Regions:
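Short loop/turn segments at secondary-structure transitions that flank enzyme active sites
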Residues: 8, 30, 34, 87-89, ...
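Alpha-helical scaffold segments that mediate packing/assembly in large oligomeric complexes
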Residues: 1-73, 190-194
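Generic structural signal for alpha-helix starts
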Residues: 5-6, 144, 184
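Short, solvent-exposed amphipathic alpha-helical segments in soluble enzyme
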Residues: 19, 96-100, 188-190
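Extended oligomerization regions of viral-like shell subunits
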Residues: 49-176
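Short helix/loop capping segments that flank catalytic or ligand/cofactor-binding pockets
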Residues: 12-13, 90-92, 181-183
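Structural signal for terminal/edge beta-strands and the immediately following C-terminal loop/tail
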Residues: 176-194
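Intrinsically disordered or highly flexible coil/loop and linker segments, enriched in small
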Residues: 30-37, 76, 97-100, 181
């Protein structure tokens, strides 16, 4: 919560209150995203062997190992690849034996996907890429996310305020209910790095 003086509310243009509420909404979003990332990582109990982050063939082997395990556990194929920002950079730097990007951004032919550093619409190994800075370093999770095996329940209540006549101020807060839950851990696998 934040306490704002009546004078600050009355004498600012644009109104300081709107900026504070927007900032609190962003902080709420970051906190809930962090909770979801932590819950997904903590709830993912299956792992492959360590991947060599610079070896494209090892990445392919590990992703397919995850796919076959997820398929065997529930008859689903994975559809998402969740990674930390450092793994995002590792994947973007992978190249084939001719030094061509493994995931080119323009005109990919026979590529395993397409990605670029400025887009959230990336496909890696045929999986939708989700990059989150709230994951711990070296996080890579392959998952069948569209199955609902990991869910997030949220009611965003928004801002609330109360006037404080004794201090000629207003206390403002931003709140909501948020509960991430791993429903079926068999639909997710972690690819660790040494």
């Amino acid at each position: 919560y934040v306490e704002v003086s009546e004078a600050s509310i009355d004498w600012t243009a644009p109104e300081v209150l709107q900026g504070l509420i927007e900032d609190m909404a962003k902080q709420y979003a970051l906190a809930t995203d962090n909770a979801a990332a932590d819950a997904l990582l903590a709830g993912t109990s299956q792992t492959t062997g360590n991947v060599d982050p610079a070896d494209p063939a090892d990445w392919i082997a590990k992703v397919y190992a995850c796919a076959i395990t997820i398929l065997s556990n529930g008859n689903y194929l994975p559809d998402h690849l969740f990674v930390s920002s450092d793994v995002f950079a590792q994947l973007g730097q992978l190249s084939d034996s001719s030094d061509r990007p493994l995931f080119p951004q323009v005109g990919p032919m026979n590529a395993f996907g397409s990605m670029n550093p400025g887009s959230r619409e990336s496909t890696v190994f045929g999986l939708r890429l989700v990059v989150d800075t709230n994951f711990a370093a070296k996080t890579t999770i392959v998952g069948a996310a569209s199955t609902g095996a990991f869910r997030v329940y949220e009611t965003q209540k928004g801002s609330i305020s109360i006037d404080n006549p004794s201090t000629l101020s207003r206390t403002v807060a931003f709140r909501g209910y948020f509960a991430p839950k791993m429903i079926d851990a068999n639909q997710f696998m972690l690819i660790p790095q040494a």
